[in-house]
A protein has these predicted regions:
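Acidic, small-polar-rich N-terminal luminal/periplasmic segments of exported/outer-membrane proteins
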Residues: 19, 27-123
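C-terminal beta-signal and adjacent terminal beta-strands/loops
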Residues: 2, 27, 680-683, 704-766
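Outer-membrane beta-barrel transmembrane strands
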Residues: 252-301, 338-383, 416-445, 493-511, ...
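Gram-negative outer-membrane beta-barrel transporters
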Residues: 442, 560-562, 566-578, 589-686, ...
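Acidic/polar loop-and-plug regions of large Gram-negative outer-membrane beta-barrel proteins
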Residues: 173, 186, 195-273, 298-344, ...
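C-terminal beta-barrel architecture of Gram-negative outer-membrane proteins
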Residues: 164, 626, 651-705, 720-737
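Structural signature of Gram-negative outer-membrane beta-barrels, strongest in the C-terminal barrel
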Residues: 350, 367-377, 382-386, 390-408, ...
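Outer-membrane beta-barrel translocator/receptor signature
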Residues: 76, 89-95, 102-183, 189-196, ...
């Protein structure tokens, strides 16, 4: 996404490392299996249409979902995972790769959802899934597969999503309209030793929810709590203006153009995947997967900026806001508040060719694997940004776009001034890796591996310098071919980089007794910036990025309890970010590089105290902190905005996390379950000035296996019906602790908890 958000996403990812690090040992005697369980990855309190983000204490890596061993998308901006992948009936398997496995096979650190497409099987088989909720969601997923004779097999899939969201918006009846189609043909050969599959996938998605649910107004009380602003209901009232049209200046051509927000967020993908596997007589197994994807990726943001109180003493006579009524007549706006928003229209044409091949050999006490990645990614990307102002209605009605007649005669202004982006070119990664999973004795298991990667980046961006050697930066009506105030012409600047990346991982488990033992692992990654980091109007820090992760602890297993307790450390150097700092009505970009580190302790337990009852418990204490987080910028009125967050707790990240997951089999066919997640106090800006109190995310439901073909379930999201804000507060980066002490009962905007939702699902085996 735009670099406006990069610092925020880095902060959001920094500290939840310990929440998930121990699950592998707590749930599986084979501590070095590639996947781990009990992560409830599809229980997402932030979204109804994708897997939850499992945070590991660092900025999110792009490769967070794999299908058939390859990334669903090489880069998630502008082509997000949810627009081309869903956890639907087309998948034969979904799991969660461990951190070490993700690091070795993809070069990124973090968990990755690991999925495989359903291939054809003997006879005729089918699955029809249906999902709905009380807001009107209609989701259908169908897989049909079978054999054609002579070892030929087929599989076809269809996914349709009609999701109106949790509130109505004027621009479209759906906040998510996604359709995905897959068709596979498989041939088994040489006595079933080999298997070749060709797959075609087409996806078409409008991810309106990305901007529709981005923010909402509330009253910040001052003690970490919030209350509703008038009749505006968080999560069930729209904060989008009625008007769906957006005027922008094309970053490539400089022309003023118009589009609808719905059209701007169109994502399309056309993919061909070839998969082959073969089992040799000597026990050697070979597999290879090649994917080509031609797509249009798009992400739209409507980012809230400053809020102005038009009726305050300081603003009397300063503004003259107008709007147009339903008849097109110009009228004076007499509301109390207006909010400035920045529209970011991110889009790019993408071609990617991804190839992975592996050789695996099992020995009596170990398994050895040798693999290779050849991943090529080409993109022509830009982000067109536009500023506009809107009303902040207290009566729960739809917001109106307004304009200040003292300054302009139309809604839109400052085209491409604040967060516009451009880059074009290719990135290539060629990597070799190996892993060895070795039972040294019946008490000691070792897992180790390494990856060597050559990263090549070639293309152009708009990081233009003037005659003095300083970056020109963005300005109003900025675009390729524009001329800055100092006479510098904005022409694409060439980019060419070649880097050697590497990582290694080692894990050990020692069984002191049959039930008790020690476990630990260490993963170290050296990376360099990805192509998307070059999107802003300045070059990023291109020094190496180091990511060490170390964990050590104990485990205990018996017939009814599996328990692990671990201490952990994780850090990352040279995070690139751009803060869009606000002072009055002015917004300025401040590029920076900083480090993050997290220490913590976690205990994870899975218990089966009596027949039919299971209980999962997770407790984490952690301290995520910023390092070298300093920047400053001078505004036009001479005010200097300084930020020094070094040593501060990372914004938006709790220090205490708790997960409670009880379930009970009422009968052999009916399961009752709940899931509770507690997140303690979080800071809402990097200066620790604003904060939100802790909250619970809750889920519960009943699963009923009616017969061997039909399964029904009912799930309640947020059954405690907690409402409130979370994340960060718009435009608050420069607010200090001392300034915040006097701020009480003030209107602000930010993200919010997913509202109470009742979901119904049915799955039919055909």
């Amino acid at each position: 996404m735009n670099t406006l958000f990069n610092g925020k996403s880095a902060a959001m990812m920094l500290a939840l490392s310990l929440m998930n690090v121990s699950a592998a040992f707590a749930q599986d005697d084979n501590a070095n299996a590639k996947e781990e369980g009990n992560r409830n990855v599809m229980l997402n309190a932030a979204s109804a249409n994708g897997p939850r983000e499992i945070q590991i204490g660092l900025p999110s890596a792009d490769v967070n979902v794999l299908e058939n061993g390859l990334p669903v998308t090489y880069a998630t901006n502008p082509h997000s995972v949810n627009t081309i992948w869903r956890g639907d009936a087309s998948l034969s398997h979904q799991g969660l790769l461990k951190i070490a496995e993700t690091a070795i096979t993809t070069g990124n650190i973090g968990y990755a959802v690991n999925s495989f497409t359903q291939k054809g099987q003997k006879g005729f088989n089918g699955t029809l899934n249906y999902k709905s909720n009380h807001f009107g969601l209609q989701e259908f997923s169908l897989n049909m597969n079978g054999d054609l004779g002579n070892d030929w097999y087929y599989s076809v899939n269809m996914y349709q999503d009609f999701d109106p969201g949790t509130f109505k918006i004027k621009s479209t009846p759906y906040q998510d309209r996604t359709q995905i189609y897959k068709a596979l043909i498989t041939k088994k050969y040489n006595g079933n030793r080999g298997e070749f599959t060709a797959m075609y996938k087409y996806a078409n998605s409008h991810n309106v929810y990305n901007y529709a649910t981005q923010s909402a107004p509330f009253i910040y009380v001052g003690d970490g709590s919030v209350k509703e602003y008038g009749k505006f209901k968080l999560g069930t009232t729209s904060y989008l203006p009625i008007d769906n049209e957006m005027t922008y200046r094309n970053m490539r051509t400089g022309k003023l153009e118009q589009t609808s927000l719905y059209d701007a967020c169109l994502n399309k993908a056309s993919e061909v995947t070839l998969m082959n596997s073969y089992r040799f007589d000597n026990g050697l197994n070979w597999k290879a997967t090649l994917k080509y994807d031609h797509s249009r990726g798009a992400m739209v943001y409507q980012t809230p900026m400053s809020i102005s109180d038009l009726k305050s003493a300081d603003n009397q006579g300063v503004y003259n806001y107008m709007y147009r009524d339903i008849d097109g007549q110009t009228k004076a706006y007499d509301g109390q508040y207006i909010q400035t928003r920045m529209s970011c229209l991110n889009a790019g044409k993408i071609d990617e060719a991804l190839f992975t091949t592996e050789l695996t050999k099992k020995f009596r006490t170990s398994t050895f694997r040798l693999g290779m990645n050849e991943w090529f990614y080409h993109i022509d990307y830009c982000s067109n940004t536009t500023m506009y102002d809107q009303s902040v209605p207290a009566d729960g009605s739809y917001a109106l776009r307004v304009w200040d007649a003292n300054q302009r005669d139309s809604y839109f202004y400052d085209f491409n001034k604040n967060a516009s982006e451009y880059y074009k070119g290719s990135e290539n990664k060629l990597a070799l890796y190996f892993t060895h999973d070795w039972d040294v004795t019946n008490k000691l298991n070792l897992y180790y591996g390494a990856r060597l990667e050559w990263q090549s980046l070639n293309g152009e961006n708009a990081a233009v310098k003037n005659a003095q050697g300083n970056y020109v930066g963005r300005f109003a009506d900025y675009h390729l071919g524009a001329t800055a105030a100092d006479g510098t012409k904005i022409t694409p600047a060439d980019l060419s980089y070649n880097w050697l990346n590497y990582d290694f991982s080692v894990a050990a488990t020692y069984k002191l007794t049959d039930n008790f033992g020690f476990t630990g692992d260490f993963t170290y990654i050296v990376q360099h910036p990805k192509f998307e980091t070059f999107a802003p109007a300045t070059l990023p820090n291109v020094n190496k990025i180091s990511v060490p992760l170390g964990r050590a602890g104990i485990y205990y297993n018996n017939s009814w309890l599996s328990l692990t307790s671990l201490f952990s450390y994780i850090s990352k150097t040279n995070n690139n970010a751009t803060l869009n700092l606000q002072h009055g009505s002015e917004i300025k970009a401040a590029p920076m590089t900083y480090d993050i580190q997290t220490w913590g302790w976690t205990t994870d337990a899975v218990a089966h105290p009596f027949k039919g009852f299971d209980f999962h418990f997770l407790f984490t204490y952690q301290k995520p902190t910023y390092k070298k987080y300093e920047t400053s910028i001078t505004f036009n009125d001479g005010y200097v905005g300084n930020i020094n967050a070094t040593g501060n707790i990372v914004a938006e990240i709790p220090q205490i996390l708790i997960e409670l997951d009880p379930s009970y089999m009422i009968t052999k066919d009916i399961k009752l379950w709940t899931s509770f997640r507690y997140f303690s106090k979080t800071y809402a800006n990097i200066n620790e000035a604003y904060y939100f109190n802790g909250h619970w995310e809750t889920f519960g439901g009943v699963n009923w296996q009616v017969n061997k073909r039909l399964a029904l379930s009912c799930t309640v999201v947020n059954f405690l019906n907690q409402t409130g804000a979370k994340g960060s507060i718009a435009g608050a980066e420069l607010i200090t602790k001392d300034e915040a002490k006097g701020i009480k009962n003030q209107i602000m905007t930010g993200s919010y908890l997913r509202p109470f939702t009742v979901e119904f699902t049915a799955s039919l085996k055909l």
